[in-house]
C-alpha cells in the first residue's frame, strides 16, 4: 500500500530560531515541509553548549511523549544534527519502534561533541580535553545511534563523507533550502560594495576582512552584517552593520553586489563538509557569492551563482589576495555581474521551499516504504 505522509505525525527536533544558523534553517525547513504531514509537533532546543544535563534529559522525555501521543505506526521523527547539538542527538538515541531520520549539518558526523553541556562548554580545557582524545569513541557512539538510519546531507560531498564513515546508513543529498525574500534592485544598480554575512565563529573567515580590505581598490566598500559582527572592528572602507533582520536585512543585501564567503577549517578534529547558510541567504536575495572551495563550497560554480576561488595550500595572505582579485573581477564587470544574477535566479528556483519539500518527501516516503516491507 502506498505511503501517504498525510497520515503521519512528524515529530521535529531542532534548535529554535535565532539559535545559530541551524536554528534559522530549522524554522524555514519545518514551515516548508509542514503541508506534507497530517500533523507536525516540535521540540525546539537552545544552541550548542547552552543547556544543562537536566535540560537535555527534559528534551528526551518530551520527545518520547510526542512520539507516544501519535497513532502507532504513523509517527516519523526528524532531527537537525550539528557539531554540538547534544539535545537533538540524545533525544533520538535509542529510539526503537519508530522511524527516525536526521539532517547532518557538519558531516560526516551528526555530532562531534556529544557531551557539550553548558558546564563542559564553559571550560575550554574540559571541552577539548574530553572530546578530542575520545574522537574514535564518539564516532562509534554515533554509529550505534544512527549507523543504520536514513541521514540527509545538504550537499553531495557531505553525503559521500557520511556514507564513507557509516556505510550501513542510507544517505541522501538535498541542497540547502533557499527561502523567499523580497526582490531588490538589479545587481548592477547596487553600490559597488561586497558583504560579509553570517554568525561569527571559527572558520567563517571574518578574520580575513582586514587582509582583503588591503587588497581591494578604494572604491569597493566592505559591509559586514550578522550576529556577533557588532564586536568586530571597522575602519576606512569597512562598515560594521551588526545584526540585521527584516527590513534591515533587506537593506543590507540591497547595498552589496556580492557576498564574500572565505570559509576555512572550523576545528582541528577532522575535515567537515558543512553547507553554507550564508550562501543560501545570499541566494535568497538574488546576490551572488565569492567563496573559497572549502568543504561543500567546492560543489558550487558559476552556474549556481558562485565565483569559487581554489585555494589549495595558499596561506592566509595569498587567500585574501586571490579573493580580492575575484571580487574585483565580478563587481567591476556589469555584464558578468548580470550573468551571475541570472544563474542565481535559476539556482534559487532549484533550491526553493517547494523543491526542498518535494525532495524530503521522496526521501521519507522511500524510507517508510522500505520499513513497511521489512516488517
What is the role of each PLM region?
Residues 261-280, 291-299:
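Nucleotide-sugar-dependent
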Residues 143-150, 159-178:
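Helix-loop-beta element that forms the nucleotide-linked donor phosphate-binding surface
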Residues 185-204, 210-213:
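Conserved donor-binding/catalytic core segment of Leloir-type glycosyltransferases
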Residues 185, 314-318, 331-368:
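A charged, aromatic-enriched C-terminal amphipathic alpha-helix characteristic of glycosyltransferases
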Residues 228-258:
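Nucleotide-activated donor-binding/catalytic signature segment of Leloir-type glycosyltransferases, i.e.
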Amino acid at each position: 500500500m502506498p505511503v501517504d505522509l498525510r497520515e503521519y505525525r512528524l515529530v521535529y527536533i531542532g534548535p529554535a530560531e535565532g539559535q545559530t544558523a541551524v536554528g534559522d534553517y530549522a524554522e524555514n525547513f519545518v514551515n516548508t515541509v509542514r503541508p506534507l504531514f497530517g500533523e507536525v509537533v516540535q521540540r525546539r532546543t537552545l544552541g550548542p553548549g547552552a543547556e544543562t544535563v537536566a535540560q537535555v534529559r527534559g528534551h528526551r522525555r518530551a520527545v518520547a511523549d510526542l512520539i507516544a501521543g501519535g497513532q502507532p505506526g504513523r509517527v516519523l521523527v526528524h532531527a537537525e544534527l550539528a557539531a554540538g547539538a547534544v539535545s537533538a542527538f540524545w533525544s533520538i538515541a535509542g529510539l526503537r519502534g519508530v522511524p527516525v531520520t536526521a539532517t547532518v549539518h557538519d558531516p560526516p558526523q551528526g555530532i562531534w561533541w556529544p557531551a557539550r553541556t553548558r558546564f563542559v562548554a564553559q571550560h575550554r580545557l574540559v571541552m577539548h580535553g574530553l572530546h578530542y582524545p575520545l574522537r574514535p569513541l564518539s564516532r562509534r557512539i554515533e554509529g550505534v545511534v544512527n549507523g543504520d538510519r536514513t541521514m540527509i546531507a545538504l550537499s553531495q560531498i557531505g553525503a559521500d563523507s557520511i556514507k564513507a564513515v557509516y556505510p550501513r546508513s542510507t544517505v541522501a543529498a538535498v541542497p540547502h533550502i533557499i527561502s523567499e525574500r523580497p526582490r531588490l534592485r538589479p545587481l548592477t544598480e547596487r553600490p559597488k560594495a561586497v558583504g560579509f554575512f553570517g554568525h561569527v565563529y571559527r572558520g567563517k573567515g571574518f578574520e580575513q576582512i582586514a587582509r582583503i580590505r588591503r587588497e581591494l581598490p578604494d572604491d569597493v566598500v566592505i559591509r559586514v552584517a550578522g550576529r556577533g559582527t557588532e564586536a568586530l572592528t571597522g575602519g576606512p572602507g569597512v562598515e560594521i552593520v551588526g545584526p540585521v533582520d527584516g527590513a534591515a536585512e533587506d537593506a543590507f543585501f540591497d547595498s552589496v553586489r556580492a557576498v564574500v564567503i572565505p570559509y576555512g577549517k572550523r576545528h582541528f578534529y577532522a575535515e567537515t563538509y558543512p553547507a553554507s547558510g550564508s550562501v543560501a541567504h545570499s541566494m535568497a536575495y538574488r546576490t551572488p557569492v565569492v567563496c573559497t572551495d572549502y568543504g561543500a563550497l567546492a560543489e558550487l560554480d558559476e552556474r549556481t551563482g558562485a565565483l569559487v576561488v581554489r585555494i589549495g595550500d595558499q596561506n592566509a595572505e595569498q587567500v585574501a589576495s586571490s579573493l580580492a582579485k575575484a571580487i574585483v573581477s565580478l563587481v567591476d564587470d556589469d555584464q558578468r555581474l548580470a550573468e551571475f544574477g541570472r544563474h542565481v535566479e535559476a539556482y534559487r528556483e532549484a533550491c526553493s521551499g517547494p523543491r526542498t519539500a518535494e525532495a524530503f518527501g521522496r526521501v521519507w516516503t522511500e524510507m517508510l516504504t522500505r520499513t513497511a516491507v521489512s516488517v
